[in-house]
Amino acid sequence: MKNIKLKLARVEKGLSQQDLADLTGVTRQTIGLIEKGSYNPTLNLCVAIARSLGKTLNDLFWVEDNE
């Protein structure tokens, strides 16, 4: 499942995939795969992404049944 919430939060913050990758210590490809739903990040990476974007884990990674 695509992570639209993550992509929207990144774009709203004015960050490219590379910018977010640099902030979180991963590659741009990893951020792209997470956004496409092709990669399940570790909890530590989820926390780093959320902190970098000023969001909570729920804001970015919680999926409601109707989503």
What positions do the PLM features span?
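Key DNA-contact positions within bacterial/archaeal DNA-binding proteins
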Residues: 18, 29, 58
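DNA major-groove recognition helix of helix-turn-helix/homeodomain DNA-binding modules
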Residues: 44-59
